[in-house]
A protein has these predicted regions:
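FNR-like FAD-binding dehydrogenase module
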Residues: 1-166
Length: 166
């Protein structure tokens, strides 16, 4: 992504057009094969955000999780219209697990119109896999997230998606 001024970052100007759910193709060093990740942010956020699970021996995930602030990667954006929340007012039910929370978090963050959004999120371990867990109470207080239901498959209090009530 090209460098953007502070004003461009605050207003979302100076970035290519993209939204949560679009894809970013990352070309890891040592490979010509891009790895596609769903974006957890939109242009108006002023940053590009993805959720990455580090795979043991994984080339791209290993490089991405080792990045320091200000580091650069070779990447491209690809629209993914099949993974966009429409602009309607009908309630939105989001279901995801693990790193699949990325675009869903982007939809919630971008819900400035306070559309009813219900998130059902599954994870293995609540202490390490509850991505965006610190932000969710704020999203609920702001009216961006109506309901949060979680399932944790490992640990002391296990629960599984079949036990969810929608």
């Amino acid at each position: 992504m090209p460098r953007a001024t502070l004003w461009q970052r605050l207003t979302g100007a100076g970035f290519a057009r993209f939204q949560a759910g679009d894809l970013i193709g990352v070309l890891p060093q040592g490979s010509a094969v891009p790895r596609l990740y769903s974006l957890a942010s939109g242009r108006r956020d002023g940053f590009v955000e993805i959720v990455v699970r580090k795979h043991p021996g994984g080339l791209a995930s290993g490089q991405l999780t080792a990045l320091e602030p200000g580091a650069r990667v070779t990447a491209f954006l690809r629209r993914n219209p099949g993974c966009h929340a429409d602009r309607g007012r009908t309630p939105l039910i989001l279901i995801g697990a693990g790193t699949g929370i990325g675009p869903l978090a982007g939809f919630i963050r971008g819900n400035a119109r306070h559309r009813p959004v219900h998130l059902f999120f599954g994870m293995r371990h609540a202490d390490s896999d509850f991505f965006y867990g610190e932000e969710m109470p704020g999203w609920q207080a702001e009216g961006r997230l109506t309901r949060l239901v979680t399932a944790v498959s490992r640990g002391a209090r296990r629960s599984y998606p079949p036990h969810w009530r929608i």
